[in-house]
């Protein structure tokens, strides 16, 4: 396809290996250093992109305190080849933060407010725990269900409403690990993982070019033996069917169609449409349904037009109802999360939006797809979606 001057194109994508938050490979690496390394290496492998042209570094991060505080986007940017004259901002839409970073850059490009952006995100959940420094307002319970901030219970609710069984969830969790392991063995992650130094379980410094979160030894019997993680009496959501708590970062170079043509760059994809939507916080995991429907309508497409889908696997109990109501549950094995998802790879909050978007682009490239959807639920009841077209 030919590009229009204000089209938003993805030039390249990279991510760190996903590390376990408890004693994992990134345990001695700070979030800013992880981010700076990733940005620097991605720019290094895209020599046609002059760092001086970067308008803004837009970085997703949820818990913006400790090493992730004081505008981590700027902290990381200052340690890269990007000059001090370029700007940087940190954004949060909880789980959808780095996809929001992508949308912010896209909107700037579409309106002529910049041509070259670096976007992505990071979350070091081992150094800055999920609830560190968080003080929820008790008055919220007057406006939303008391458990709306407890993601596992919202997944339990959504699964119950849609009749999702424990066995269905266990099968979905097993699938995630099997597909992620298969992708690793077959080298499918090679283009997206940017190697990093880290520490192995014995404390030795080594270069990691693989995700240490994947458990190829996972069995259906093992998953079935796990106790409910959030509702001990009658719950069906377990640690094995929930996204892992992990550390990681992801990064994209985004630019206008005009600048890509001027530089002679063949982009990975162009953004066809974007959308966000809200749902009741008590069923926060349902957000991808309205946001995807909205994005498809804006692009003049239907779900039948979409070749591949990346849906963030916050919980199996959440992902399955979304796929059911998007009418792709029966096409899951052909179209959805073909390299596994967050159950196997983890969900470092600020990282995940750009991570699933980049993984989608690699799946499309490797399998010859043209149109793809990246979508995710967002804590407290939101959904965010991006529709991509490969060029």
Swiss-Prot record:
Catalytic-site annotation from UniProt: 95 (acyl-thioester intermediate), 347 (proton acceptor), 377 (proton acceptor)
Keyword 4Fe-4S appears in the UniProt entry: no
Record keywords, A-Z: Acyltransferase, Cytoplasm, Fatty acid metabolism, Lipid degradation, Lipid metabolism, Transferase
Coiled-coil ranges (or none): none
One GO CC term on file: cytoplasm
A GO biological process held by the record: phenylacetate catabolic process
Top-level division of the source organism's lineage: Bacteria
UniProt enzyme class: transferase
NCBIfam families the record matches: AcCoA-C-Actrans, fadA, PRK08947.1
Protein name according to UniProt: 3-ketoacyl-CoA thiolase
């Amino acid at each position: 396809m030919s590009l229009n001057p204000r089209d938003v194109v993805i030039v390249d994508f990279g991510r760190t290996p996903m590390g376990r938050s408890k004693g994992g490979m990134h345990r001695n690496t700070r979030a800013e250093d992880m981010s700076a390394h990733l940005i620097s290496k991605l720019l290094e492998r895209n020599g046609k992109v002059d760092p001086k042209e970067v308008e803004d570094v837009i970085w997703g991060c949820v818990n913006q305190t400790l090493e992730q505080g004081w505008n981590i986007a700027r902290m990381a940017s200052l340690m890269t080849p990007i000059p001090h004259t370029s700007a940087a901002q940190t954004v949060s839409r909880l789980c959808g933060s780095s996809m929001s970073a992508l949308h912010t850059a896209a909107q700037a490009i579409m309106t002529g407010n910049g041509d070259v952006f670096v976007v992505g995100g990071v979350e070091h959940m081992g150094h800055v725990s999920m609830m560190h420094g968080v003080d929820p307002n008790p008055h919220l319970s007057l406006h939303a269900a008391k458990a709306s901030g407890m993601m596992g219970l919202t997944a339990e609710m959504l699964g119950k409403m849609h009749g999702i069984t424990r066995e269905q969830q266990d099968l979905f969790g097993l699938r995630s690990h099997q597909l992620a392991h298969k992708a690793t063995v077959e080298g499918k992650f090679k283009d997206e993982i940017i190697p990093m130094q880290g520490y192995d379980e014995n404390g030795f410094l080594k270069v990691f070019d693989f995700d240490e979160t994947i458990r190829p030894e996972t069995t259906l019997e093992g998953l079935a033996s796990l106790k409910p993680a959030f509702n001990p009496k009658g719950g069906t959501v377990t640690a094995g069917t929930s996204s892992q708590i992990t550390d990681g970062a992801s990064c994209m170079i985004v630019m206008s169609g005009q600048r890509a043509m001027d530089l002679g760059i063949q982009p990975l994809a162009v953004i066809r449409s974007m959308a966000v939507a809200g749902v009741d916080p008590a069923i926060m995991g349902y957000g991808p349904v309205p946001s995807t429907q909205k994005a498809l309508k804006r692009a003049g497409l239907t779900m039948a037009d979409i070749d591949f889908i990346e849906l963030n696997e916050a919980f199996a109990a959440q992902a399955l109802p979304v796929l059911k109501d998007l009418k792709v549950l029966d096409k899951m094995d052909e179209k959805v999360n073909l390299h596994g998802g967050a159950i196997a790879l983890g969900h470092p909050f600020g990282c995940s939006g750009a991570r699933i978007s980049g993984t989608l682009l690699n799946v499309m490239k490797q399998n010859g797809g043209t149109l793809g959807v990246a979508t995710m639920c967002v804590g407290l009841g939101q959904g965010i979606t991006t529709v991509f077209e490969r060029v």
